[in-house]
UniProtKB/Swiss-Prot annotation:
This is E3 ubiquitin-protein ligase RNF19B. The chain crosses the membrane at residues 340-360, 396-416. Residues 57-72 have a biased composition (Low complexity). One of its GO terms (molecular function) is ubiquitin conjugating enzyme binding. SMART domains: IBR. InterPro entries: E3_UB_ligase_RBR, IBR_dom, TRIAD_supradom, Znf_RING, Znf_RING/FYVE/PHD. E3 ubiquitin-protein ligase which accepts ubiquitin from E2 ubiquitin-conjugating enzymes UBE2L3 and UBE2L6 in the form of a thioester and then directly transfers the ubiquitin to targeted substrates, such as UCKL1. Involved in the cytolytic activity of natural killer cells and cytotoxic T-cells. Protects against staurosporin-induced cell death. Residues 1-304 are annotated as: Required for ubiquitin ligase activity and for protection against staurosporin-induced cell death. The gene is rnf19b. Keywords: Endoplasmic reticulum, Membrane, Metal-binding, Repeat, Transferase, Transmembrane, Transmembrane helix, Ubl conjugation pathway, Zinc, Zinc-finger. Zn(2+) 4 binds at C273, C276, C293, C296. Its EC number is 2.3.2.31. It is an enzyme of class 2 (transferase). The lineage of its organism: Eukaryota, Metazoa, Chordata, Craniata, Vertebrata.
Length: 701
């Protein structure tokens, strides 16, 4: 009886030996384990067996998702009851750091774990990125002409051999080397690139400013271009007129082209770099005006097209950081006057506000910082309050000292900027418009500027070693000496109302003469050490010279109109080193007929052929003492030729002067300059004549 009662008691299910007579109670009191959720046996009651099935399926699906995320194959459904194999957390965590015994590193660019062999270590820094990301990075940089390559994570420069190893692309490497070469040649002022299409040949034209006709020596090219304007060669034409002609033809071609639309971008969006001349396109998207050339690395302002520093937009230059055009002259002058007048009031107001703000604001700021420092820490309230009180008390003592030092240093700096930097910056080069008239006091010019910088203006502003920087625009008569070599500009143009512009030795002169008018021009050129700037030319019937700025330009062939009683006198004084020009006295000059005809149909000559010639034939003659109405014209023009090298030059100079004068040349109607009948006094000199080379040449016509 006792054994039966014990077996029927509710505590019998806890015993180690199960009782077959008590199946029901033993089933109800059984323990629930994690293994039983997946492998539960169906009992006689189906309702109880179906309760744990959905929960088991959900847990099984979650486990499969985790396994797929960790890149592990799914485990089979029948999992053993061993707890060491039931939890796969430990083997999966170790697989993230190694794969087959190899160390995995995370790329900072694509955030993908890869073997260490795929992440090369760059020289100079400890950063590592995968090869795929590095190749894409270098490909983008080289395609956009950025050759100053650096590490993607720091500013450490990459060596060319590292770039070659990472790229492993001969075409990109060739382009990279070409961009490096262009960047290097951009610093050479005498480097000229061939303008022919599909030609990347460069010419180092050192000392060719006096003979600007250059020829590309690349095999199959042979293009001729100008040293000054860097465009196709334009014989008997100035650089400005050739540029205008090209612009006109391009505009005409664009208007008739079917692909031309009126919605194309403005020319103001494309400007050349002020250092290397590479064209740069600026998107009209509201970006800043601080530009950086990708070819030469020049930093310049898009509005004024000048190389700038970081303080350019803080100075009163009229250029704004975000604007589309610079300030007008009126706005700059008004801003200057307002600054000069209102500076004391503004500085006093700023100092009056800054002193109490610092005296009150510094203690408040210190107290808040100390309170936030102790807020998250487990410290006593007494210690925190003591630190806050001490910091505020110390800041109250030091705040007046800081305010006094700031005002004592800041106010003189602002006064020096307002009354020193602002006037100097605005009045530099006449930008302030303030001028002093004769007996009229100070005059302020409020005329507006010409407008924004265009492509043509930007090209004219390029720094070039050419001797000619003068413009041929306008019809004002006078002598322009804007070239660095102080050259001569002579223009015996039409003797009527229409001026003629011809450039010689670096300048431009528009001669406008009327009835009984007289023109006298005298120019001087000092000898320089540079061979290209030691030569002067006074016109020749050859097309072997650019007439832009023109040391070594030509005078175009023309016929003087028949004007009654008009005399023209030109005096030329050139001081230079001895050249191959040889002049004799007036008795040695014979009147050949060849000198009377203009040099038409001559073959163009390059620099070498130009230097080999000693005297160029004159295109026309103006006989001294003969009136133009009688149709007798004779001229004697001398042209010192280019000197080959500094070794062939002599430091001695001669004082010989060849003069062709007449006592009657000053009269409106000269009959003759000599007692004998007038004769032509100009002939082509023989290059073989061993005559003395003069230094000073004075010509009277």
């Amino acid at each position: 009886m006792g054994s039966e009662k014990d077996s029927e008691s509710p505590h019998s299910s806890v015993s180690g030996i199960p009782n077959p007579k008590c199946r029901g109670p033993g089933k109800k009191q059984g323990r629930i384990s994690f293994h039983s959720l997946f492998h539960s046996k169906r009992g006689p009651r189906g309702s109880k067996a179906n309760v744990g099935t959905p929960l088991a399926q959900q847990l099984h699906q979650q486990q499969q998702i985790q396994q797929q995320q960790l890149l592990q194959p799914p485990t089979p459904t029948n999992v053993s009851s061993d707890p060491s194999t039931a939890d796969p957390a430990e083997p999966l965590s170790t697989s993230q750091a190694s794969l087959g015994g190899q160390e995995l590193l995370e790329c900072p660019l694509c955030l993908v774990r890869q073997p260490a062999e795929q992440l090369p270590e760059l020289q100079g820094c400890s950063h590592r990125s995968c090869l795929c990301c590095l190749r894409q990075y270098l490909r983008i940089e080289i395609t956009e002409s950025r050759v100053q390559l650096s590490c993607p994570e720091c500013a450490e420069r990459l060596a060319p051999w590292q770039v070659a190893l990472i790229l492993d692309d001969p075409n990109l490497m060739e382009k990279y080397e070409e961009f490096l070469l262009r960047r290097c040649l951009a610093s050479d002022p005498d480097c000229r690139w061939c303008p022919a299409p599909d030609c990347g040949f460069a010419v180092i034209a050192s000392g060719c400013a006096s003979c600007p006709r250059l020829v590309c020596r690349r095999e199959g090219c042979g293009a001729e271009f100008c040293y000054h304007c860097k465009q196709a060669w334009h014989p008997n034409q100035t650089c400005d007129s050739a540029r205008q002609q090209r612009a006109l033809s391009l505009r005409t071609h664009s208007n008739h082209s079917p692909s031309y639309t009126a919605e194309q971008g403005h020319t103001d969006d494309i400007k050349p770099c002020p250092r290397c001349g590479a064209y740069i396109i600026k998107m009209n998207d509201g970006s800043c005006n601080h530009m950086t050339c990708a070819v030469c690395g020049c930093e310049f302002c898009w509005l004024c097209m000048k190389e700038i520093s970081d303080l350019h937009y803080l100075s009163p230059s009229g250029c704004t950081f975000w604007g589309k055009k610079p300030w007008s002259r009126k706005k700059k002058i008004l801003w200057q006057l307002g600054t000069l007048i209102g500076a004391p009031v503004g500085i006093t107001l700023i100092a009056g506000i800054a002193v109490p703000a610092m005296v009150i604001g510094i203690p408040v700021y210190i107290g808040r910082k100390i309170h936030s420092h102790y807020e998250g820490k487990k410290t006593s309230h007494h210690r925190r309050n003591l630190a806050i009180t001490g910091g505020v008390a110390l800041s109250i003592i030091t705040a007046p000292v800081i305010a006094a030092v700031s005002v004592g240093i800041g106010v003189p700096i602002m006064l020096a900027y307002v009354y020193g930097v602002v006037p100097i910056s605005l009045c530099r080069g006449g930008g302030c418009g303030v001028s002093r008239g004769k007996g009229r006091g100070v005059r302020i010019d409020f005329d507006e500027d010409d407008g924004p910088i265009t492509v043509a203006d930007a090209w004219r502003a390029l720094k070039s070693p050419s001797l000619g920087e003068s413009s041929l625009e306008g019809a004002a008569s006078g002598l322009s000496t804007t070239s660095p070599s102080e050259g001569l500009s002579v223009a015996p143009g039409g003797l009527g109302d229409t001026p003629h512009f011809n450039t010689l030795a670096g300048g431009a002169l528009g001669a406008r003469t009327g009835k009984y008018s007289r023109l006298e021009v005298q120019g001087t050129e000092l000898g320089k050490e540079v061979a290209g700037r030691e030569t002067g030319s006074l016109g020749a019937a050859s097309d072997c010279a650019s007439t832009r700025g023109m040391a070594g330009s030509i005078t175009s062939s023309y016929t003087l109109p028949d004007r009654e009683g008009t005399n023209l006198e030109i005096q030329v004084d050139i001081e230079t080193k001895p050249s191959h020009l040889c002049l004799t006295t007036e008795e040695d000059l014979a009147p050949p007929t060849a000198a009377m005809a203009p040099g038409v149909g001559e073959e163009p000559q390059d620099c070498s052929s130009r230097r080999s010639r000693t005297v160029m034939d004159s295109p026309l003659g103006l006989s001294p003492g003969m009136s133009l109405r009688e149709g007798l014209r004779d001229v004697t023009l001398a042209q010192p030729e280019s000197i080959r090298s500094d070794l062939e030059m002599s430091d001695t100079q001669s004082d010989d002067i060849a003069e062709l004068t007449s006592d009657d040349c000053d009269s409106p109607h000269p009959k003759s300059c000599h007692g004998a009948p007038p004769q032509a006094t100009c002939r082509a000199l023989n290059p073989t004549d061993s005559l003395h080379c003069p230094d000073n040449v004075i010509l009277y016509v």
